[in-house]
Amino acid sequence: MPRIGLLIVTAVLATVVAGCSKESDQSSEKSPDWQRGRAVFLANCVACHNNDPTKDGSIGPAIAGSSKELIESRVLSTSYPANYKPKRPTKVMPQFPFLKEEVPYLAAYLAK
């Protein structure tokens, strides 16, 4: 009987460990552009936006699914594209001109 219990416990633990590592496996399967965009996002955006771009941050809104056009407008000039209705029409976001080359990578990361 003890062997069966040990086998069951081992199987349960293996299942839990496999489930925990699923997210890291998925991110390693992402493109280099996605991974670079994630690094840029974590280094420059999470002070205001949530670590999880699908959720609102302390200051900034959720930004997952944002278009490249919107990201470029907001990051480089803090404006909005024509005919875009903002989630929060604030003037709080600063410009990040040094991220000009990173916009395509941010767009890859934030795409749905």
What is each residue range found by the language model?
Residues K30-N51, E72-S73:
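Sequence/structural segment immediately N-terminal to covalent heme-attachment motifs in c-type
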Residues C20-V40, D56-I59:
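Electrostatic cytochrome c docking/interface patches
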Residues M1-A18:
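Sec-dependent bacterial lipoprotein signal peptides
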Residues V16, F41, P94:
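Conserved Rossmann-like nucleotide-binding pocket used by diverse enzymes
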Residues A62-K112:
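Extracytoplasmic electron-transfer domains, predominantly the class I c-type cytochrome c fold
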Residues T10, L42, K68:
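ATP/adenylate-binding site constellation spanning eukaryotic-like Ser/Thr protein kinases
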Residues E23, H49-K55, L76, A111-K112:
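Detector for the c-type heme attachment site
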